[in-house]
Amino acid sequence: MKMNLTKTVAAGAVSIAALIAGGGAAFAECAIQGAGSVRILSNDFEALRVVNDAAASCATDTVAITANATAEHKNIQGPALTANPAEYTVAVVANNSIVPLLNDGLIRPLDDLVAQYGASLQPNQLIKIDGKVMAIAFMGNGQHLFYRKDILEKAGLDVPTSYEDILADAQVIKDMGLMEYPLAASNKPGWDLAAEFVNMYLGTGAEFFAAGAADLAIDNESGRKVLETMRAMTAFMNPDYLTYDANELNKVWDAGNVAFMQQWGSLAGATIDPATANPEVAANTGFAAAPTIGGGTTPAAALWWDGFTIAQNISDEDAAASFQAMVHGISPETVAAHPDAATWLVAGYTPGPAAVGVIGNATGGAKAYPMQPYMGLLHTALSAELADFIAGKEDADQALKDVKAAYDTAAKEGGFLK
């Protein structure tokens, strides 16, 4: 069951390029049939706030709608949806955070709701597990290259396409006195730091686990190449690089202090927003697919989709109201009003400049974030055990040993390893 689930969800993730090219569909209207309570749990960034606000506009005297947008959503969702009735009726998920909800039976099939209220949805938005629709995808995401066009021009450099190029270009930019610290990345110990490793490792083409098993397989040449590259980049970063998460990166970028960074596509729009971004930096901000690594040919970044699910432990009335509100939240009208907030997977969306990087990842063959049920245990182990390495306190061999020890312990406790 879990392996089928993994393959099916991954297939949904890698269809992002096709989703973006999807055709038209009927426009949604905010006219919820019936009554109910809609309680949304999501991550906290611009695109999801747009969706939540649009969904909330459907509130009436008989339909109450609330939303909790928080970076802690992944930690909250399991316990909150386990309660009966569930604390939230809607969980906005990505292709990693849906897995525990599926494994624990905390979200419901959506086929009946799609048939009744989903006229505006495209077929490829329907994330199916074992033939049942379990989530509705509405945006593609991924970390990709942000670069300063003016700095490259002054240095006489082309847009880099590999991490090796980025390191060489950073040296040129520093030697020319254009910037002291031309690089930045999400190296804050925790989820962000682990994602940096996962992205680069995906670019090597190597497997995270032994074939058909939960045994860890990153202690290899590819794993060392990734760590070597991560460490090499810190030589061109501000000394406080350990404090940078994704949100902090945008602040550093807007201040004009960085020439290259790997950042989320969902945050690209903010860097060129004429209403809020530094005009000089915004005018010189460019986007491209994530770089390759170690002679690889595919962008070294995970491909993601974001979508919504409906809780199992709620009334059918609340489920129907929640589905209708969320369909309005991701409607073509919402997307038309906020075209640069995300790489939308919605009918009628025309990709703008902020979508270039995510589309480049998808068309370049970037792989979906791994969907094995034990991948979360590896991500957690990387989150904790790479901190000393990225700080320069231990070598790659020790870091890989530490990650394996932490992962093996968790995988045994979870029943994945003996």
Model-based region annotation:
Residues M134, Q143, L167-D215:
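Extracytoplasmic/periplasmic solute-binding protein
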Residues N95-G142, D158, L167, E196, ...:
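Hinge/lid segment of periplasmic solute-binding proteins
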Residues R108-L121, L183-G190, T204-K225, P274-T285, ...:
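Short, solvent-exposed loop/beta-turn-alpha elements that line the ligand-binding surface or hinge
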Residues N4, A10-G12, F27-S97, L242, ...:
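Conserved N-terminal structural module of periplasmic/extracytoplasmic solute-binding proteins
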